[in-house]
A protein has these predicted regions:
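Positively charged n-region of N-terminal signal peptides that target proteins for export
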Residues: 1-5, 552
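Structural signature of tandem-repeat unit edges
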Residues: 22-23, 33-47, 56-69, 79-94, ...
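Bacterial N-terminal signal peptides
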Residues: 7-16
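A structural signal for leucine-rich repeat
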Residues: 427-432
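C-terminal outer-membrane/trafficking sorting elements
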Residues: 471-552
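A recurrent domain-boundary module in secreted/ectodomain proteins
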Residues: 450-471
Length: 552
């Protein structure tokens, strides 16, 4: 009996709350979470409050004509909501974040003219949404607006729309047709991420900017045409688009062209991106090219080799990795060079110049060697090297970047000659099958590696013995313009075989320039060496350039 009175008392106390749960104060509607069925928002309402209908059981809502704002999460997680309509003459101006997100039964909606702003994730994860009408007064499609709307098959963006924001259509896996308006100015990062239904794509004139990875993982996309109006692009617009055969550019553009199906700047100075299905046994980068952009040949399995001009000034991260390249051909210059078949560059830091291991040919087999004198291994440097079985790291190595050994399927052994473990990031070994890899270090370094962040993830062995190999293989180049000989008095004698004046520079294997001189046509000269050892001799003239190893 006492329990009955207690329950009755609770009911009496809660009754006023239930009766007053739905409230309208100063035109703001709130507390509708207990509603179900059809609901018409009264004309006196000018604003629907945050979470007003959150997780309610309403099935249909008519938004009154005087509502100017629908606030954050107002209808979020309404699992039974099927229909939303707006009264004739709607004055709606603003929609907040997550307003209609996670409404799995909502199939269609027509937003009224006059709407000026939508918040992020407006229709996020509405798996039944098939038809959407947007007003011409809306100039920005917000971040994550239609993300994971998997039933959406076609979309038409109205005139007046200017910006497609980050991840706006990400995960719309069945989106097959997108009509972009002529007023679109920019397309943001991953705007069309994983749109598996897209087969062809033509970006309309007027678009000036497309950010990196805008069409990433459009895995069935075969052809794409970019507009002549395009002025700026990010890195790897079409990353992980394995069926893409060519990137075309409409004629008349001032900033971009397509050459061999590859996206270039109009003056050929920058190579931006090759499509995944681009084929070449040895692609020769144009002599005019000064920059190879980040990820330019990433995931291009049918490119077997590349020849890079000596005039290159910049090569971006992951530009030459995770593809089918078995070798790089490159004469080298003051900033970039090849050694042991791998690409290196000289970086300027607060501690001075540092040698960075940048890329190893993905199709190369056997052992990969990071040469003595190298300070850092770049992000993705050996990504996709499926056939390397071992890796040697020098005692001079200070650190390694992210995804360095991603997808190195046959890697079994890593030999590190550094007593102090090189610094790793949490992503350095990402994508590597760690249980199958053995780390070999000197006995005195064993405990340090076992305690070092991320090194402890690898099986350890203290079986490294002997001295670290410091000899360095130079690029396979024919030096026909310079003859040299070494005398026991420590002098290196040089003789020019060229008809042009050349610059001759001598380097240590860790990249330090020891001597530089100018050699006239067919002249002789000499350099006094500090000690016997291994050196790099670089000669450069207007006719040719070469690098070779000198062992004294």
């Amino acid at each position: 009996m006492r329990h009955y009175y207690l329950l009755a008392l609770i009911g009496v106390l809660l009754l006023p709350l239930s009766l007053s749960a739905q409230t309208i104060v100063d035109g703001v509607l709130s507390g509708c979470m207990s509603l179900s069925g059809r609901y018409v928002v009264p004309d006196e309402v000018t604003k629907i409050d945050n979470f007003a209908f959150f997780s309610s059981s309403v099935t249909e809502v008519v938004i009154g004509k005087n509502v100017r704002e629908i606030s954050n999460s107002a209808f979020q997680n309404c699992m039974n909501l099927e229909h939303v309509t707006f009264a004739t003459g709607s004055k709606l101006e603003r929609i907040g974040d997550d307003v209609f997100s996670d409404c799995p039964k909502l199939t269609e909606i027509a937003l009224p003219e006059g709407l000026q702003r939508m918040g992020v994730r407006t229709f996020w994860r509405n798996e039944s949404l098939k038809q959407v009408s947007l007003p011409t007064t809306l100039d920005t499609l917000p971040k994550y607006c239609f993300q994971s709307c998997t039933a959406l098959r076609k979309m038409s963006l109205p005139e007046g729309m200017k910006v497609i924001a980050e991840n706006a259509f990400a995960g719309c896996e069945n989106l097959m047709q997108v009509k972009l308006s002529s007023t679109i100015d920019s397309i943001a990062t991953k705007a069309f991420y994983k749109n598996l239904g897209l087969l062809t794509l033509t970006i309309p004139e007027g678009v000036r900017s497309i950010a990196d990875s805008a069409f990433m993982r459009c895995e069935n996309l075969e052809t794409v045409t970019l507009p002549a109006s395009l002025e700026r692009v990010g890195a790897k617009l079409f990353r992980r688009c394995p069926e893409l055969t060519a990137i075309s550019v409409a004629s008349g553009g001032k900033h971009f062209i397509s050459r061999d199906g590859i996206l270039y700047s109009a003056d050929l100075k920058t190579l931006y991106e090759a499509p995944a299905k681009f084929k070449s046994e040895d692609y020769k980068v144009p002599a005019e090219t000064e920059t190879i952009y980040h990820y330019a040949f990433y995931e291009c399995p049918e490119v077997q080799g590349i020849t890079i001009p000596q005039t290159i000034k910049r090569i971006g991260v992951a530009a030459l990795v995770n593809n089918g390249m078995r070798q790089f051909t490159f004469p080298g210059n003051d900033k970039y060079w090849l050694a042991n078949g791998s690409l290196y560059y000289k970086a300027t830091t607060n501690d001075g110049e540092q040698t960075v291991f940048m890329a190893h040919p993905s199709g190369a087999e056997g052992e990969a060697i990071v040469t003595y004198g190298t300070s850092f291994v770049s992000d993705y440097a050996l990504a996709g090297c499926h056939k390397i079985s071992s890796l040697r790291l020098p005692s001079t190595l200070l650190g390694m970047g992210a995804f360095v050994l991603s997808d190195c399927k046959e890697l079994k052994d890593i030999y590190s000659y550094a007593i102090e473990p090189p610094v790793l990031t949490e992503e350095s070994f990402m994508g590597l099958n760690l249980p199958s890899v053995q780390l070999h270090v000197y006995p005195e370094a064993m405990q340090k590696y076992m305690n070092a962040p991320y090194w402890q993830l690898i099986l350890h062995g203290d079986d490294l013995t002997g001295e670290e190999p410091r000899a360095i293989e130079s690029p396979e180049l024919q030096t026909t313009q310079l003859s040299w000989s070494y005398q026991h008095d420590g002098t290196l004698h040089l003789e020019s075989l060229s008809a042009a004046t050349m610059e001759v520079a001598l380097y240590s294997t860790d990249g330090v320039r020891l001597a530089t001189l100018e050699l006239a046509p067919h002249a002789t000269a000499q350099i006094t060496l500090p000690t016997a050892g291994v050196y790099l001799l670089r000669s450069t003239s207007a006719l040719t350039s070469s690098v070779e190893r000198v062992m004294l």
